Design a protein with these regions (language model features):
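Bacterial Sec-dependent N-terminal signal peptides
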Residues: 1-27
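Conformational coupling and interaction surfaces
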Residues: 25-32, 50-60, 201-314
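Active-site histidine-anchored catalytic micro-motif
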Residues: 27-79, 121-229
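Alpha-helical substrate-recognition element adjacent to the catalytic core
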Residues: 80-83, 314
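Short, structured active-site "lid" loops
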Residues: 83-89
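Surface-exposed loop and adjacent secondary-structure segments within mature catalytic domains
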Residues: 90-119
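Short acidic, glycine/serine/threonine-rich loops at helix termini
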Residues: 103-106, 162-164, 233-234
């Protein structure tokens, strides 16, 4: 009960200020794989908390929580959060391909050290986790056709590896064929719209290019500019809640310069992946391009495009 109350303090306004779903509507839960770079920024912690809150309300079935970041503290932090929300057995995985991004927190307070040091988890370091590619292929092969939503709030490294994978013990299909058969859509916190440079794109430019050009299903982008103006966490750190890794991550970092709240880049993608973009956002169809080796992206509107990007709903 306390966890639910404290999550309401962090997210209630964020997920309800633009509209409410009727209590009589009971859609099937979304089958979700979350792919995160948790570590460079702590908004991933809030995004995972939002995901777990929606799982507790029956709106999402969390199939896996994967790391796109090689940093050794990512998987322990993911497991801390899964365990805190009473889901310690959610499969995890980490990238094994090289080269890949390995990025620690850029905040002075090393919250990625504090969480594993103070809360239970199974895996000592990220490199001990199963191969994210194998986890993807195993889970996708077991799901009904067009039933899985993938939400990436990190780099595209794992998704590139998935697209370029071949048949294995889990499926005779290539990675691209497996995605086309099993995935309903990809929702990604990536890009700056209509053009610019954004962290999740430029940290692994080759992977971003592959996914932008070859992904066979619908992609919905929640760009940097969306979450950049949505601040969360202020009420959370003021609540009388103890022994919460979510509150700890926010409280540790707030002291460094976020007194009014932290930007919610990753929350927006999780929200769209689970609840859809309406009534929170409008979308425009088009094509997404990574136009240079520095990771600059642009967007070309096209009513027949299979990619969408979100913009605030009036």
């Amino acid at each position: 009960m306390k966890k639910s109350l404290f999550l309401m303090g962090l997210f209630a306004l964020f997920i309800s200020c633009k509209g409410n779903v009727s209590q009589t509507d009971k859609p099937q839960p979304v089958n979700l794989i979350l792919d995160t770079d948790l570590g460079p920024d702590y908004d991933d912690v809030g995004a995972m908390a939002l995901m777990h809150a929606l799982a507790d309300s029956g709106q999402v079935n969390i199939l896996a929580t994967l790391s796109s970041n090689h940093d050794e503290r990512v998987i322990p932090c993911i497991e801390v959060l899964n365990t805190y929300f009473n889901h310690p057995d959610i499969p995890v995985g980490a990238p094994k391909s090289e080269p890949g991004a390995s990025l620690t927190t850029w905040h002075e307070t090393k919250w990625t050290d504090e969480l594993p040091a103070n809360y239970p988890h199974h895996t000592a370091k990220t490199s001990d986790a199963p191969d994210a590619l194998k986890v993807y292929r195993k889970i996708l092969s077991e799901q009904p056709d067009t039933s899985v939503v993938i939400c990436t709030i990190g780099f595209f490294s794992n998704l590139r590896d998935l697209l370029q994978s071949g048949a294995d013990e889990y499926s005779d299909l290539s990675g691209k064929e497996l995605v086309a058969k099993k995935v309903k859509r990809l929702v990604s916190m990536a890009g700056l719209f209509p053009e610019g440079k954004e962290f999740n794109v430029y940290c692994d430019v080759p992977a971003s290019k592959v996914v932008a050009e070859e992904w066979p299903t619908e992609i919905v982008f929640s760009g940097f500019e969306i979450g950049n103006v949505i601040l969360t966490g202020k009420k959370l750190v003021q609540m009388n809640v103890e022994n919460s890794p979510v509150k700890d991550a926010y409280a540790l970092c707030f002291a460094e310069g976020d007194p009014e709240g932290r930007m919610s880049w990753d929350h927006t993608a999780v929200l769209v992946a689970i609840k859809g973009y309406e009534p929170y956002f409008d979308v425009e169809r088009g094509t997404f391009h990574v136009v240079d080796d520095e990771g600059t992206n642009n967007w070309v509107a096209n009513p027949n495009g299979c990619l969408l990007y979100t913009s605030p709903s009036p």
